Amino acid sequence: MSDSKEPRLQQLGLLEEEQLRGLGFRQTRGYKSLAGCLGHGPLVLQLLSFTLLAALLVQVSKVPSSISQEQSRQDAIYQNLTQFKAAVGELSEKSKLQEIYQELTQLKAAVGELPEKSKQQEIYQELSQLKAAVGELPEKSKQQEIYQELSQLKAAVGELPEKSKQQEIYQELTRLKAAVGELPEKSKQQEIYQELSQLKAAVGELPEKSKQQEIYQELSQLKAAVGELPEKSKQQEIYQELTQLKAAVGELPEKSKQQEIYQELTQLKAAVERLCRRCPWEWTFFQGNCYFMSNSQRNWHDSITACQEVGAQLVVIKSAEEQNFLQLQSSRSNRFTWMGLSDLNHEGTWQWVDGSPLLPSFKQYWNRGEPNNVGEEDCAEFSGNGWNDDKCNLAKFWICKKSAASCSRDEEQFLSPASATPNPPPE
């Protein structure tokens, strides 16, 4: 019996050895001794023991690598946390973030409120129609201004501004469209312009007289006003005035009659030139003297020279009537005007340019507190309702005086103020 058991044990040992080799175990001397010790236990228990032992060995070998991987992973997480903390530190404070968020919300809402493409196309079409309508009007400054404004609005709409801006543009376009609609038709404007041209040509052929010049000036002003394209009510008013002017011009004498009147006036003027006149043209006659009120300004000494060049002298006042007449002329024009009075020769001693002294009765004409000789004021002037002393080197107007010419009685009657001025043409 013992002999038969030994071959079986050897066979079982060989089988166990092959199974263990299939599981990946290498046969060692210790292993053989251990197998020998366990040879008397069940085969399943031996296999389970060896399996647990192998698993423990594998886990023990993996512990160091798992620890290193966990450490590297923690380091990576720490670095990410550090970077995130730094990034959060750079963010603005909470109020700033809320403000940005609100602005984003508003922008999103504004973009959502933009008009649809069809609405934008409608605005663009109205712009094109307005542009075409303005292009048909005559080339006037007001229309060019409208056209430029339309072009600017067209460019602005093309840039799609925010809703409030688009509404403003749309309202302005509506007003412009209404304004263009109120303009007269092209044919009506041409008719007005043609009538203006005809009236201008007709008036241009009339003799140069005050009434006709007034009509001509009014026509020119009306033409300029029509060129600026005022509002409809103003255009109707201008058109009515043009109609009235046209009727008035039609009532004027014929061209041949006007030429006859003009020739007679020319002959009359030539005859008057040959007659004796008390004072030259642009001079004023008063009590046997002629007075010239300048339209330019000079200092006191140059004013004396200017009067001498026309055979006169800087005015010397001889009577209260003459003083009142000259003071009235100066105050009416609201001018500071030199007279021929100074104290240049001796301070405080006033005398006229003809060498005569200032009479005591004339001292009443000085303004209150004058003469005061502030800053070497040595020359007298008409100032307001009286006299004033001022610096002689200042530029002021001046009055020249000379005796009037003597004429016969018939010439004096003929040259009365009523006959000396040519009659205007009949109105």
Swiss-Prot record:
Residues 96-280 are annotated as: 8 X approximate tandem repeats. One of its GO terms (molecular function) is pattern recognition receptor activity. Residues 1-37 are cytoplasmic. It is a single-pass type II membrane protein. The chain crosses the membrane at residues 38-58. Residues 59-427 are extracellular. GO terms for cellular component: external side of plasma membrane. Glycans are attached at N80. PANTHER family: MANNOSE, PHOSPHOLIPASE, LECTIN RECEPTOR RELATED. This is CD209 antigen. It comes from Gorilla gorilla gorilla. The lineage of its organism: Eukaryota, Metazoa, Chordata, Craniata, Vertebrata. The gene is CD209.
